[in-house]
């Protein structure tokens, strides 16, 4: 899998084009934004259960041009305008943790639930912004129980998705920002860098990826 950037570029172009639309609270034709009725129609079209792939960047010692790995993943869109991923895999970010003790603790932990709020802002094609909540992992770190929180960028058009009503292809991009231990937000375990934030993209899709290889 070598073409994550191609996917992200295509999605980014669509998101940028849709930013001219704004949410509105009225059904008036004079509004340039998406109406409540259109939001309901978008939700009705997208809700349901999905299976596909999560795509994320990794190092590949065998091929310097191939930095993408994939895992199977399942998610659902609920009636309360949420994306729910019951088991978000730690493998999507483990390679970016340089603290070996933290990496081992997360590798041994159970996958955790991810909840992401959807904000529809374009009806045709269906495009939406994503507001992911932190994913909380129960871990044992240095012999003690802790909670590790995976935090994402939100309120940005880099966290978004699209849905094709004819093919039912669902695609979304999220940007991982930080991994914190308990309430300590002064140390970001992602990348183990001096910066307190990272920008690590992942993509989730049920598209046929073999067509893009």
Where do the protein language model's features map onto the residues?
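Bacterial Sec-dependent N-terminal signal peptides
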Residues: 1-6, 12-46, 210-213
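First exposed extracellular module after export/assembly in secreted or surface-exposed proteins
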Residues: 34-213
């Amino acid at each position: 899998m070598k073409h994550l950037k191609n996917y992200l570029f295509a999605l980014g172009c669509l998101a940028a084009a849709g930013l001219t639309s704004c949410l509105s609270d009225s059904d008036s034709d004079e509004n340039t934004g998406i109406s409540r009725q259109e939001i309901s129609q978008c939700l009705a079209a997208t809700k349901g259960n999905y299976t596909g792939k999560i795509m994320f960047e990794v190092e590949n010692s065998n091929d310097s041009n191939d930095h993408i790995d994939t895992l199977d993943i399942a998610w659902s869109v609920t009636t309360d305008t949420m994306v729910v991923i019951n088991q978000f895999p730690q493998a999507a970010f483990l390679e970016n943790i340089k603290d070996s003790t933290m990496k081992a603790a997360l590798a041994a932990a159970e996958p955790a639930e991810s909840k992401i709020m959807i904000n529809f802002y374009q009806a045709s094609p269906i495009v939406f912004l994503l507001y992911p909540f932190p994913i909380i992992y129960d871990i044992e770190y240095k012999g003690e129980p802790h909670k590790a929180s995976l935090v994402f960028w939100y309120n940005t058009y880099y966290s978004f998705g699209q849905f094709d009503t004819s093919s039912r292809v669902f695609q979304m991009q999220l940007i991982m920002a930080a991994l914190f231990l308990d309430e300590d937000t002064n140390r970001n375990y992602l990348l183990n860098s001096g910066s307190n934030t990272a920008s690590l993209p992942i993509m989730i899709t049920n598209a046929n990826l073999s067509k893009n290889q």
